[in-house]
Amino acid sequence: MWGVVATATYETVYISFASTLLAVLVGVPVGIWTFLTGKNEILQNNRTHFVLNTIINIGRSIPFIILLLILLPVTRFIVGTVLGTTAAIIPLSICAMPFVARLTANALMEIPNGLTEAAQAMGATKWQIVRKFYLSEALPTLINGVTLTLVTLVGYSAMAGTQGGGGLGSLAINYGRIRNMPYVTWVATIIIVLFVMISQKLGDTLAKKVDHR
């Protein structure tokens, strides 16, 4: 039994981290682009900003369980199946991408207005402004955002597990409910809570470590 619990725990960790990584790889650049094309920013483009903003808002407004069903054909096309841990990563990462993009854009909006002028006065290029000034200044907030995304996806992964995605959610359903072993549900819940608490603590510690403000 404990071997099954260990496997389910590994699956949840795998799903959560892989989904977060994909969401960050797409969401952070989109969030940066959204911010940079905003009003009075260095790449201001009202049309592009409007399109990106609209896509992000639409993506964030769709409930995960509905998005999970909508993306079944996409998941089947990419992975070859809609069941299993790898298949669960597709809807989870797509669900989190607009969330990460919004967190990134908001983090950059918190940067003091005078930073751009100071960077330009030092002769920095637009790319240097983004990399050495904006991202450096916003890094603690971005780390907090990634941590929030990870712990959110842990909960969503349990939801995906009830639809055949594997992990602790699937364990709780298959053993706790169907096989009438309620203690398994409690074990799965405790493991999820511990994973979230540890992830949050590590994220908070890292954010404080890189915060030199």
UniProtKB/Swiss-Prot annotation:
Residues 9-202 form the ABC transmembrane type-1 domain. Keywords: Cell inner membrane, Cell membrane, Membrane, Transmembrane, Transmembrane helix, Transport. It holds the Pfam family BPD_transp_1. The chain crosses the membrane at residues 13-33, 50-72, 89-109, 139-159, 183-203. Belongs to the binding-protein-dependent transport system permease family. CysTW subfamily. Part of the binding-protein-dependent transport system for D-methionine. Probably responsible for the translocation of the substrate across the membrane. This is Probable D-methionine transport system permease protein MetI. It comes from Haemophilus influenzae (strain ATCC 51907 / DSM 11121 / KW20 / Rd).
